[in-house]
Amino acid sequence: MRIAILFLIFTTNILAEEIIGIPKIVDGDTVQINEYKIRLEGIDAPEMKQQCKKPYLQIMFFTFQKDYFCGQVSKKKLIQKIGNKPVKCILLGKDRYKRYLAKCFKGTINLNRWMVRNGYAIAYRKYSKLYVPDENLAKEEKLGLWRGTFVEPEQWRRKNK
């Protein structure tokens, strides 16, 4: 009997809960499905009011850049990628703001990875190194944020509290 109870306790903690539904996109790294506010684990997207720079004109060796709201672009790209389709989020825990941390999928596409690989978010190295190779590829190919210059979202939040 004790073994059965211990087995139930340990397996309950090991099994990850899945949430499936059509999400409301809050920003580039947060979605909401029903009452579940979900942070895409291991990534950090620019904040909604954050401005980044992107090239718009190159003359000889000079590249002129202009400001744009990169957090809004990040959110828009996630909306476009998901469309009006259901996603499956595998809940991995909670963050200090009580949001669920999750890996989310549209079909077989890992949305966390897709955001980083396409340059709309960065790997959140403070919490996970999982998406660093994807970030390196996006940087190498100058995709998304990597086309121009930007302050890492965590640094931007600290400066703009």
Positions of predicted regions on the chain:
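Small beta-barrel nucleic-acid-binding modules, primarily SNase/OB-fold domains
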Residues: 2, 13-161
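Sec-dependent signal peptide hydrophobic core
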Residues: 4-9
